[in-house]
Every structure is written in structure tokens, then in C-alpha cells.
């Protein structure tokens, strides 16, 4: 049955073979829909699908201008932000492969993954650039380092991400059609991502995922949980996480919906404090979580309910029971006798 479902989904969207196709489809269907929300100057600012694609094209051109060839690997070490999406999609448009890195990695772990993957370039946010400077001499394959929102002057092999965008714009004007030619060469069996295991029991393994892998996962998740185009998600899971990556970034993109990043602040602790504050600002329709985090959410919610008295607690428990019966497995709305409980 599983293979039949995958085949049926592929036939339904037969022109979707790559992650690039997912963005192109949404830019065609939902050009003015907001895709990304990012907090700047104290307020969440929107970027539409057409605006995102323009930035992606500039990144692709900038990467090609510095010599990125099809199949080259680019490591990405950053908290979730607009530039994370621009960077990954841009390097994919240029035919590259992303090597997303967890922001929780130690310097030694970063060195292993970058060198093992053979990444030629590195995109890093300003918050983690000092970590990279400490191990720069050990990153033997890295030729250029692009810094997102640098707080200090960058020089040498360090280049600001904004400079990558502006140089890409100039390069596109001087080389019309070259980015489009590279884009057309990307196929579903091309490598899109090398996702490393944690390495808790042995050396980390690089899981090689193709464009086709991601597209099939997006279509399968969409068949289970429908995401209307007006939906917003506040994506507080690490963006290199495979769940957040597939469902948060790409499933929402496929449906013309939008995702918001958490305001990182000045430290990981400030990031955690900003999550509930940003939830009130963004008002997301959906949250993605993992068991440990969901358990903490539930614990805090139920602690607050207990403070409101026994009657409110009874209403909560009754509503929870009704919801479980109505939604069944959680894959769809209640049907049949579930409606009357």
C-alpha cells in the first residue's frame, strides 16, 4: 500500500521532481503570499514568495560567481532566519548540496562534519562566526565563508552574506540566463542534503538525501495533514532538524503558507525566552515539536489550568477527551460516529 500511495502522489504532481520545483510551483500559484516572517526593528516583517525567489536567485548567482560547481557542498551553520532559507535554496538552485549543521555542535564536531563532507563554502551567522575563527585552520576544504549579519568588518576569505547577494545581482546582469541554465540541470536524483547523525555511539554518518527524497516526503506529509495557504508556523525547532526541515520549511512552501523564525536575540537563553513572546506576536496556526518539548509545553499548560480551579480543570480534561475521540489518530477531522461521539 505504501508504494502505491507514493506512486499515486507522484502521478498527482508529476512535474515535481526537485526542491526547486516546489518553490517554482508556489511562486507561480502564490506569488504575493507571505512565505517568511522575520523580526526586524522590533516588528515581524513579511517576505513574499516572489521576493524570496529573487533573493534565492541572487544567492545562486553569487555562489556561481565565486566558483561553485554542480555537486559542490556548502555547509550551513546558523540559527533559523530568512538567510537560512535564502542560503539553502540558493545553493540548491546553483546545483550545490547543503550540509546543515546543528548550532549545538562543539568546534571539534563542526570540523569533522565540514571536512568529512568536503564542503567548499560555509554560510555562518554572526553568533557562531567566532567558533569558526577558532577552527578556521582545521577546515581544510573551505574556500569562502559567508557571514550572516556580521557585527564586525569581514575580510580575507570572510564575506558578508549581503555582499554575496549584491555580487550575485551584478553577476546575473552580466551573465543573463546562466543561473537558469544551471537550475535546469538539477534532477530529482541529485544530492540535495547531507544530514549528519548525532554520533553518540560511533563516528557521525552523513545521510545523503536527494531532491526526490524531499519531494516525496513533502507530498506524503501533505496527504496526511492539509496545510491551508493562510497557515503560519513559528518554527522554533532547529532548522537543520530533518522534521523541521521537511515539514516546516518545505511542506509549508509547497502549500503557499508561511513560516516565522524566532527572534534569536543575543544568546541561546534569550532565544528560549523569546519563544512564548513570539508566539503571541505571530499567532501561529500550527507548531512543530518533539516529544521532550511537547511534554514541557503540556506540563506548563496544565500547571496554569490547575491554578484556575477545579471547574476549569474539569472543562480542560473533558475537552481533551472529546478532542481525542473526534480526531482519532490525528491525521484528519472526525468522521462517521466520531462526530456524535
Where are these regions (language model features)?
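AMP-dependent adenylate-forming
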Residues: 22-47, 153, 201
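A short helix-loop-beta submotif of the ANL/AMP-binding
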Residues: 73, 79-99, 103-107, 115-121, ...
Amino acid at each position: 500500500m505504501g508504494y502505491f500511495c507514493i506512486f499515486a502522489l507522484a502521478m498527482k504532481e508529476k512535474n515535481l521532481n526537485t526542491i526547486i520545483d516546489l518553490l517554482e510551483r508556489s511562486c507561480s500559484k502564490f506569488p504575493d503570499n507571505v512565505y517568511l516572517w522575520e523580526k526586524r526593528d522590533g516588528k515581524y516583517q513579511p517576505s513574499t514568495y516572489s521576493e524570496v525567489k529573487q533573493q534565492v536567485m541572487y544567492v545562486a548567482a553569487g555562489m556561481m560567481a565565486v566558483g561553485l560547481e554542480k555537486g559542490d557542498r556548502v555547509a550551513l551553520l546558523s540559527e533559523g532566519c530568512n538567510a537560512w532559507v535564502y542560503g539553502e535554496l540558493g545553493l540548491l538552485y546553483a546545483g550545490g548540496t547543503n550540509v546543515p549543521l546543528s548550532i549545538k555542535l562543539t568546534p571539534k564536531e563542526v570540523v569533522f562534519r565540514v571536512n568529512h563532507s568536503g564542503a567548499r563554502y560555509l554560510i555562518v551567522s554572526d553568533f557562531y562566526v567566532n567558533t569558526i575563527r577558532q577552527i578556521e585552520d582545521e577546515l581544510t576544504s573551505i574556500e569562502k565563508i559567508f557571514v550572516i549579519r556580521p557585527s564586525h568588518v569581514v575580510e580575507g576569505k570572510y564575506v558578508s552574506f549581503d555582499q554575496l547577494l549584491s555580487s550575485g545581482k551584478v553577476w546575473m546582469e552580466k551573465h543573463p540566463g546562466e543561473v537558469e541554465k544551471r537550475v535546469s540541470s538539477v534532477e530529482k536524483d541529485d544530492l540535495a542534503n547531507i544530514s549528519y547523525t548525532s554520533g553518540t555511539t560511533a563516528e557521525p554518518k552523513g545521510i545523503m538525501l536527494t531532491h526526490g527524497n524531499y519531494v516525496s516526503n513533502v507530498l506524503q506529509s501533505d496527504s496526511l495533514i492539509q496545510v491551508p495557504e493562510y497557515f503560519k508556523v513559528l518554527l522554533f525547532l532547529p532548522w537543520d532538524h530533518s522534521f523541521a526541515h521537511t515539514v516546516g520549511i518545505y511542506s509549508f512552501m509547497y502549500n503557499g503558507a508561511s513560516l516565522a523564525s524566532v527572534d534569536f536575540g543575543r544568546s541561546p537563553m534569550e532565544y528560549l525566552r523569546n519563544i512564548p513572546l513570539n508566539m503571541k506576536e505571530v499567532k501561529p496556526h500550527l507548531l512543530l515539536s518533539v516529544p521532550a518539548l511537547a511534554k514541557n509545553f503540556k506540563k506548563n499548560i496544565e500547571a496554569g489550568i490547575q491554578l484556575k480551579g477545579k471547574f476549569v480543570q474539569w472543562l480542560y480534561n473533558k475537552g481533551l477527551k472529546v478532542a481525542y475521540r473526534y480526531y482519532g489518530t490525528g491525521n484528519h477531522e472526525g468522521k462517521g460516529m466520531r462526530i456524535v461521539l
